[in-house]
């Protein structure tokens, strides 16, 4: 079952979520019919699950469309990336022309700019709602935080990466996040040197971001300590600048 089929699926019982909660194995895509009409209740359910709560105009528009057509629009990430029109997004974060204290004040102001911009992106009505929900999801999965990164430009770059791969290849996203400037700082990649490897990111990548702890059916562990060591060695030398 692919993502598109999943989003088209609808519970088989009239209460909307009952069959899902009861563990029903019926994954047949929802198709409107007389006993299960496409109505305001089902349209609102779809829009809530794929966004942050629909506006009335969105609900009215959805009711005039079909579930399949709405899902096609929601999964279309072919449009241009939204840009944050602030000069600081392309400034050198390590520009020494200003005093460190002044530069830190800039970072604080820029962080507020970034937060407001991102929240506004989530609130924009229309087909980008699901993409923005996925950006939030990936930020919670490949977690980092400004309190350690301290460079607003890098948080902005990471936010754009999650948006680019909102519906893309998980493998490629994992590859990209491994050298993402914010992640390199957050999980100590900048201190990962050939002469003294730092295994923090390698361990997090395998344990939390991808494979997880446990074993396969044949008893083989998902990864070994040696895998962590070798991955850490493979990622030595990366800095926030590349």
Would you name each region that the model predicts?
Residues 54-72, 106-242:
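Primarily short, surface-exposed interaction patches in extracytoplasmic proteins
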Residues 5-113, 122-124, 129, 222, ...:
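N-terminal module-boundary/linker segments of secreted carbohydrate-active enzymes
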């Amino acid at each position: 079952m692919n993502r598109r089929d999943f989003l088209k699926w609808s519970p088989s019982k009239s209460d909307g979520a009952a069959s899902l909660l009861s563990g029903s194995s019926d994954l047949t895509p929802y198709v409107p019919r007389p006993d299960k009409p496409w109505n305001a209740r089902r349209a609102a359910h779809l829009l809530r699950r794929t966004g942050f709560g629909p506006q009335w105009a969105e609900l009215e528009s959805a009711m005039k469309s079909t579930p399949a057509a709405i899902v096609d629009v929601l999964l279309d990430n072919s449009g241009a990336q939204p840009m944050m029109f602030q000069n600081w997004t392309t400034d050198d974060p390590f520009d020494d022309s200003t005093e460190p204290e002044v530069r830190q004040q800039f970072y604080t102001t820029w962080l507020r700019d970034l937060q407001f911009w991102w929240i506004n992106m989530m609130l924009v009505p229309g087909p980008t709602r699901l993409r923005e929900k996925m950006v939030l999801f990936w930020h919670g999965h490949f977690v980092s935080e400004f309190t350690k990164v301290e460079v607003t430009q890098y948080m902005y770059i990471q936010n754009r990466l999650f948006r680019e791969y909102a519906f893309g290849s998980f493998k490629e996203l994992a590859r990209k996040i491994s050298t993402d400037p914010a992640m390199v700082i957050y999980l100590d990649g900048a201190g990962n040197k050939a002469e003294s490897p730092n295994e923090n990111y390698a361990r997090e990548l395998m344990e939390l971001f991808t494979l997880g702890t446990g074993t396969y059916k044949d008893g083989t562990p998902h990864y070994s300590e040696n895998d962590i060591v070798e991955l850490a060695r493979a990622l030595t030398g990366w800095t926030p600048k590349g």
